[in-house]
Amino acid sequence: KTYLYMLSRKQHLFYETAQIPKKDGSMRKLHAPVRSLKVVQKWILVEILEKVKVSPYAMAFVPGKNGLKENALLHKDRVFILEMDIHDFFGSITQRDVFHLFTKIGYNYTISAILANLCTYEGVLPQGAVTSPYIANLICYNLDMRLSALCNKRDIVYTRYADDLSFSSDNRTRLNRIERLLKEIVRDEGFEINDKKTRYFSNDRKKTVTGITINDREIHADRKLKQRIRSKIFHAVSEADYSEAAQIRGLIAFVDSIEDGYRDQMACYMEGLALKKELRRSAKVVRAYNENKLFRDLEDMIPL
């Protein structure tokens, strides 16, 4: 108990800060807990937080749910999609919010205060804490229910993937009319919409939901991502450089979770590379391929 109390009161001693580049070129601060605090947070996540149900509209960070795929499937049959983004999502959830969450779960004020301290840093949810995504989902329960109630009356599909809010309808006018009301609810729940990231999609242009492309009511992973994967595979095989093997496997698994059979496609692609004469003539390439197979079930490359 004394150790937990110390962890909760001296958070600044148990976090490491890193700068992570964002797509727009700016930097994001990532506060990651050191191992001792991370172990405690993992226990809180599994033994406390994940035993509380999130709203049915929360798609991300839910155990047993393929959130990205399920999210896209819910919107794929609609003609128009409105995507909105919550600004500074984790940073908008305060230590007080987390304290009240634990009291609602059933803990007394003292325990709730300790748990809130263990799960926050500098007064808000930290980007790098394992507990932050699920806490954010629980905090957003009221937001999800209010937005869904508004949308259900208008035959609009609503989902939330972390800080990405998705709304779809067969009627563009309904989405236009509801946008202001959506922002008011989001603001009333303590968040702000990042207007720069608000986007409309329709059937006359490529539709995307949380990064997944929808064409002809079918969902696909981003084409540029798949091109990048093939490029990485070719580089690994032809240059005998498997330093990014783990990343390649992870990217393939991600796309395969969206598009059934993608792993098999990439296995066939690698088997095709293994048959290329110009590659089989290099002892270095052959040896590296056979020693670093991206998939265990691939046949050996036969040297010439």
Language model features: what each stretch is:
Residues 149, 153:
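Conserved helix-loop functional segments at active or binding sites
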Residues 83-87, 128, 132, 154-169, ...:
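Catalytic palm active-site di-aspartate
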Residues 113:
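A short, basic-hydrophobic beta/loop patch
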Residues 110:
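TRNA-recognition modules of translation machinery and tRNA-sensing kinases, especially anticodon-binding
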Residues 1-21, 27-84, 89-104, 117-129, ...:
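Right-hand nucleic-acid polymerase module
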